[in-house]
Amino acid sequence: MKGHDSFMREALRQAQRALEAGEVPVGAVVVHGGHLVGVGFNQPILSEDPTAHAEIVALRDAARTLDNYRLSGATLYVTIEPCLMCAGALVHARVGTLVYGAAEPKTGAVRSAMRALDHPSLNHRVAVVANILEDECRGMIQEFFAARRHAANKEM
């Protein structure tokens, strides 16, 4: 069975697809029973859908693959710590484990800016594993935003 690094590399490949599409490079995959059942990359601009974050796209793909919106026992791998919307989707989908690459200090809703998955009112708990391939995950998004800032400065 593949380990965390291997599945996170799959998520990084999805993030590369987002980058190539001009989107913020975030990628996600869903694994169930050791098998890849869902993939997604960040695509709100491409799809004109503000909810089309990598995690949501991957959860939707997995739900279609498994013919069930409840993804009990599944693990979601994502390159960057999920936002509040995506953290909520993990709970609603009953995902068993979240594995993320790099923290998101401004909007990370799992450990950084808030701890949404720890709220006592939730009816489902998601186990969390952080910092898998952290340098690669952080590096991809930092390079993206550095290039954007550089391009914006050239236009001034």
Language-model features and meaning:
Residues 68-81:
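Immediate flanking context of iron-sulfur cluster ligation sites
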Residues 32-33, 60, 72:
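A cytosolic small-molecule/anion-sensing beta-strand core signal
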Residues 22, 70, 94:
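Conserved functional loop/turn residues at catalytic and ligand-binding sites
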Residues 11, 15-18, 28, 38, ...:
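Small-residue (primarily alanine) positions within well-ordered alpha-helices
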Residues 1-18, 33, 85-156:
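Zinc-dependent deaminase
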Residues 26-34:
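Short beta-strand scaffold segments in enzyme catalytic cores
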Residues 37-44:
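Short beta->alpha transition motifs characteristic of CBS
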Residues 46-56:
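A short, polar/charged loop-to-alpha-helix boundary motif
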